[in-house]
UniProtKB/Swiss-Prot annotation:
Reactions that this protein is recorded to catalyse: 5-[(5-phospho-1-deoxy-D-ribulos-1-ylimino)methylamino]-1-(5-phospho-beta-D-ribosyl)imidazole-4-carboxamide + L-glutamine = D-erythro-1-(imidazol-4-yl)glycerol 3-phosphate + 5-amino-1-(5-phospho-beta-D-ribosyl)imidazole-4-carboxamide + L-glutamate + H(+)
Protein's recorded name: Imidazole glycerol phosphate synthase subunit HisF
Stretches assigned to coiled coil: none
InterPro entries: Aldolase_TIM (IPR013785), His_biosynth (IPR006062), HisF (IPR004651), IGPS_HisA/HisF (IPR050064), RibuloseP-bd_barrel (IPR011060)
Lineage: Bacteria, Pseudomonadati, Pseudomonadota, Gammaproteobacteria, Enterobacterales
UniProt keyword annotations, A-Z: Amino-acid biosynthesis, Cytoplasm, Histidine biosynthesis, Lyase
This protein's record includes keyword Lyase: yes
Location(s) in or outside the cell: Cytoplasm
Annotated GO MF terms: imidazoleglycerol-phosphate synthase activity; lyase activity
Gene: hisF
Pathway(s) this gene product operates in, as recorded in its UniProt entry: Amino-acid biosynthesis; L-histidine biosynthesis; L-histidine from 5-phospho-alpha-D-ribose 1-diphosphate: step 5/9
Highest taxon listed in the record's lineage: Bacteria
Length: 258
């Protein structure tokens, strides 16, 4: 059995790490490189960096900080933000990233997933899915351009349909960003995670809602996710990664101990 992964998420805007609630009202957390090093030293299995306004601004993630991060950490990291072409991805990978993640550009051009997977291998390609539960319809819908609240829009895709579509096109991993839960720290949306797990054959990463160590345990135990991504509980030092891993190991979760 592969070890479950603990993955701090660093949302990047204007060269700094920020954090919002339900993808809104972002506050500045700190500088990118020191935070990355701190999480690596604490025992994170992987880091994810989202340049949250790159897609909505029509640009690619700033590659300069990617190289600086690669110099100071020795764990895998994934970078997302406005990647629209093989050339964009190649440059980010050449600067030291281990994976690239695409979200809004994949919705605009689903063939991008296949082209990237064919060029770099599925193990490098993560598809991020920003999913929102609509109380009125009782359905989960995929949103696009969520880094800019003035441009965010609901797409034609229901979440489960898009999960299946991206797998068919070559996604090697799926990061499910549950917008309703983002930043509120009241637990992952286990109902949605279980539904996605039923149709997801590739590694599945849960994102949005972690507030306690028990929330991580529930995601691993009840929804069988492969990794749990979180931001505010780590940024605000509510949970220490080493202590979290010790707790999970004590609960029988297969995890890499620091």
């Amino acid at each position: 059995m592969l070890a479950k992964r603990i993955i701090p998420c660093l949302d990047v805007r204007d060269g700094q790490v920020v954090k919002g609630v339900q993808f809104r009202n972002h506050e500045i957390i700190g500088d990118i490189v020191p935070l990355a090093k701190r999480y690596a030293d604490e025992g994170a299995d992987e880091l994810v960096f989202y340049d949250i306004t790159a897609s909505s601004d029509g640009r690619v993630v700033d590659k300069s900080w990617v190289a600086r991060v690669a110099e100071v950490i020795d764990i895998p990291f994934c970078v997302a933000g406005g990647i629209r072409s093989i050339d964009d991805a190649a440059k980010i990978l050449s600067f030291g990233a281990d994976k690239i993640s695409i979200n809004s550009p994949a919705l605009a051009d689903p063939t991008l997933i296949t082209r990237l997977a064919d060029r770099f291998g599925v193990q490098c390609i993560v598809v991020g899915i920003d999913t929102w539960f609509d109380d009125a319809t009782g359905k989960y819908h995929v949103n696009q351009y969520t880094g800019n609240e003035n441009r965010t829009r609901v797409t034609q895709w229901e979440t489960l349909d898009w999960v299946q579509e991206v797998q068919q096109r070559g996604a090697g991993e799926i990061a499910l960003n549950m917008m309703n839960q983002d930043g509120v720290r009241n637990g992952y949306d286990l109902t949605q995670l279980k539904k996605v797990r039923d149709v997801c054959r590739v590694p599945l990463i849960a994102s949005g809602g972690a507030g306690t160590m028990e929330h991580f345990l529930e995601a691993f135990r009840d929804a069988d996710v492969d990794g749990a991504l979180a931001a505010s509980v780590f940024h605000k030092q509510i949970i220490n990664i080493g202590e979290l891993k010790a707790y999970l190991a004590g609960q029988g979760v297969e995890i890499r101990i620091c």
